Amino acid sequence: MSVLARLEATIAARKGADPDSSWTAKLLAKGPEKCAEKFGEEAVEAIIEAVKGDRAKLTSEAADVLYHLLVMLAARDVALAEVLAELERREGISGISEKASR
């Protein structure tokens, strides 16, 4: 099992838990909109570190982005497997062609 799959399982286990028991439970209890907002904040922080060029800080922020993406997906009951299946579907297809097909 990959680290992302284990993280997804941990997030799922916290869904519906007492919001005071963990940051994940607290975030999920606030609803999908708050989860999306937090994902956006973390994405912006990663962008800033990418522009600055600090490798260690970018790595840390990228980890935050992945975590908050999984929380946002869980808030909307979208499994990581669904996202991975979509990536597999797109694999080998030109980005220009794929975008035109939407």
Swiss-Prot record:
<comment type="similarity">
    <text>Belongs to the PRA-PH family.</text>
</comment>
<dbReference type="Pfam" id="PF01503">
    <property type="entry name" value="PRA-PH"/>
</dbReference>
<dbReference type="GO" id="GO:0000105">
    <property type="term" value="P:L-histidine biosynthetic process"/>
</dbReference>
<keyword id="KW-0378">Hydrolase</keyword>
<protein>
    <recommendedName>
        <fullName>Phosphoribosyl-ATP pyrophosphatase</fullName>
        <ecNumber>3.6.1.31</ecNumber>
    </recommendedName>
</protein>
<dbReference type="InterPro" id="IPR021130">
    <property type="entry name" value="PRib-ATP_PPHydrolase-like"/>
</dbReference>
<dbReference type="GO" id="GO:0004636">
    <property type="term" value="F:phosphoribosyl-ATP diphosphatase activity"/>
</dbReference>
<keyword id="KW-0547">Nucleotide-binding</keyword>
<keyword id="KW-0368">Histidine biosynthesis</keyword>
<dbReference type="InterPro" id="IPR008179">
    <property type="entry name" value="HisE"/>
</dbReference>
<keyword id="KW-0028">Amino-acid biosynthesis</keyword>
<dbReference type="GO" id="GO:0005524">
    <property type="term" value="F:ATP binding"/>
</dbReference>
<keyword id="KW-0963">Cytoplasm</keyword>
<dbReference type="GO" id="GO:0005737">
    <property type="term" value="C:cytoplasm"/>
</dbReference>
<comment type="pathway">
    <text>Amino-acid biosynthesis; L-histidine biosynthesis; L-histidine from 5-phospho-alpha-D-ribose 1-diphosphate: step 2/9.</text>
</comment>
<keyword id="KW-0067">ATP-binding</keyword>
